[in-house]
UniProtKB/Swiss-Prot annotation:
This is UPF0254 protein Maeo_0668. Belongs to the UPF0254 family. It comes from Methanococcus aeolicus (strain ATCC BAA-1280 / DSM 17508 / OCM 812 / Nankai-3). NCBIfam families: PRK00962.1. It comes from the Archaea. It holds the Pfam family HcgF.
Length: 166
């Protein structure tokens, strides 16, 4: 069984929840296009929505502080796209090290297309959504979120096929 963990910000835990529901055989997911790949082969060992720096640092035992936010925004992390990519990588690495899972997925997005990182047992994948968004002004954040969820799950399944031969 391939173990998976997520640390999500702008995707609000929906990647981990979706994978969990498919993996667990929820009735509503039995017709999902990836059901036959995920169900019976994958299990979620942790799925977290972590919007704050403090939460990420404490939960994931990062060992070093995350970068200072590029933007002031309530209590959530808010970075440029460049720093979102760095932070997503740090979060995924912390998650993989803390939980010793096969695949760690992390997402974060402030201003720009956001940052997504998937770390498998063999490789690291760092990418963005296809949608420019702005957490501060709330511009395109729902569209960016949906795109990020879809793109990440598609990439996750691509990794399962390529690296785990499913």
């Amino acid at each position: 069984m391939i173990t998976v963990a997520t640390a999500e910000c702008f995707t609000l835990g929906k990647i981990g929840t979706t994978i969990h529901k498919i993996a667990s055989g929820y009735e509503e997911c039995k017709n999902h296009r990836y059901y036959n790949i995920i169900n019976g082969n994958v299990k979620i060992i942790s799925s977290s929505f972590i919007p704050s720096i403090e939460g990420a640092e404490k939960l994931l035992n990062l060992g070093a502080p995350l970068p200072k936010c590029d933007y002031e925004y309530s209590y959530s992390k808010a970075y440029t796209e460049k720093n979102d990519l760095k932070v997503a990588h740090i979060l995924a690495k912390g998650l993989k090290n803390s939980l010793n899972c096969n695949i760690a997925i992390a997402t974060t997005a402030g201003v720009g297309r956001g940052g997504i990182c998937i770390i498998s047992d063999k490789n690291e994948y760092l990418f963005t959504t296809d949608i420019e968004g702005d957490l501060i002004s709330k511009k395109n954040i729902i569209q960016r979120q949906k795109n990020g969820i879809d793109k990440t799950i598609n990439k996750f399944v691509e990794i399962l096929k390529k690296e785990y031969f499913l």
